[in-house]
Regions:
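Extracellular/periplasmic bilobal clamshell ligand-binding domains
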Residues: 299-337
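Mature extracytoplasmic/periplasmic domains
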Residues: 254-314
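Residues embedded in well-ordered beta-strands
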Residues: 23, 121-123, 255-257
Length: 337
């Protein structure tokens, strides 16, 4: 009887410990995320174990572990990365609770949901480019001869660039995109290199007239979190949102989904619902300078200055993943290193 009782206690405490944790696989690298995860722990009593790595590394680990995986939630930057994980059947469907219904349909599907937004836009040097000459610019205009040797942008293997080109493919078709890319690469001011902030620095220094970069990098630079030099550089450039006269600016997401073999699916669902509360959205966005995925969220003054623009909502962000391989192939063919 005593042995049976001890076995029961052992099973009880093992079960209790198991159900009171969450194993989060994330490619996001913001210290502020960890602070938010602590708040979730305090509110729910669910311990969050964070496994941080690049999306492809996380994807490979989950595939290698298969049904033995203890991963509960996969939280990744870029819809293309989420689509890749979905294609490999790493997710299970979530329950669409009230909070998840607040996310626009174009920013989620049955397996993952957008948590934050960012726009990939153009930054210009006002000492080199007149606002009136650029105020109505589109992504398509970046291939114009007037921008020869003027544009700073990252390499073709960058997923943000691949998603942008994927959106052009979806809107304009392969023939147009192929010709557009051939002209675009002639307008690069230098060999593509560095991160998004490096592109903005190039414009601030006068090396380039235009840069293509994500909005939150600009916010980070303006905030001073990346040092005084980068803050001063960001103050020298101006943001411009393309395609405001037609479809709107290209928008992408960070998003999360519940993993197929999650041992803690209820905790995983609760965690995703928590990320979509106004409190969590405020903390996420005011720290990372991304845009909230839901409405009526209080944001800081840096975000407030750039958050009112027309978004491209006529395209499902999952399309970026579907088109990325094709986009990358065309980018390389055009000579985009």
């Amino acid at each position: 009887m005593r042995i049976v009782f001890l076995i029961f206690l052992s099973l009880f405490f093992t079960s209790y410990s198991y159900s009171s944790e969450l194993n989060l696989f994330t490619s996001r690298h913001y210290p502020s995320d960890l602070i938010l995860f602590k708040k979730f722990e305090e509110k729910t009593g669910i311990k969050v174990n964070v496994i941080n790595a690049k999306s492809k590394v996380l994807e490979k680990r989950l595939l290698d572990e298969g049904s033995k995986s203890k991963g509960d939630v996969l939280f990744l930057a870029d819809a293309g990365a989420l689509y890749s994980a979905e294609e490999k059947k790493l997710f299970t469907k979530y329950n669409e609770s009230q909070s998840l219904r607040l996310v626009p349909k174009s920013l989620k599907n049955d397996y993952w949901v957008g948590i934050t937004k960012r726009a990939r836009i153009i930054f210009y040097n006002p000492n080199l480019v007149d606002y009136n000459d650029i105020k109505n610019i589109s992504y398509e205009d970046l291939s114009d001869e007037r921008w020869t040797k003027s544009i700073a942008i990252r390499q073709s293997n960058n997923i943000y660039n691949q998603s942008l080109v994927a959106s052009i493919l979806e809107h304009r078709g392969e023939n147009f995109t192929t010709k557009w890319l051939e002209k675009l690469v002639k307008n690069f001011s230098r060999k593509p290199q560095g991160n998004d902030r490096a592109q903005i620095l190039s414009v601030a220094a006068g090396e380039s007239k235009l840069a293509v970069a994500n909005t939150y990098y600009y916010g980070l630079m303006l905030s001073g979190k990346k040092g005084d030099e980068q803050k001063k550089a960001a103050q020298k450039v101006k943001p411009i949102f393309p395609n405001q006269n037609d479809r709107g600016a290209h928008v992408n997401i960070s998003g999360a989904g519940i993993l197929k073999f999650s041992p803690n699916k209820k905790n995983a669902q609760s965690f995703i619902e928590f990320l979509l509360t106004k409190e969590a959205q405020t903390n996420l966005c005011n720290s990372s300078f991304e845009f909230p995925i839901i409405e009526n969220v209080s944001t800081n003054k840096i975000i407030n200055k750039i958050k009112n623009f027309k978004e491209d909502i006529n395209i499902d962000v999952s399309t970026y993943g579907k088109r990325q391989a094709q986009a990358f192939k065309l980018m390389k063919k055009a000579g985009w290193n």
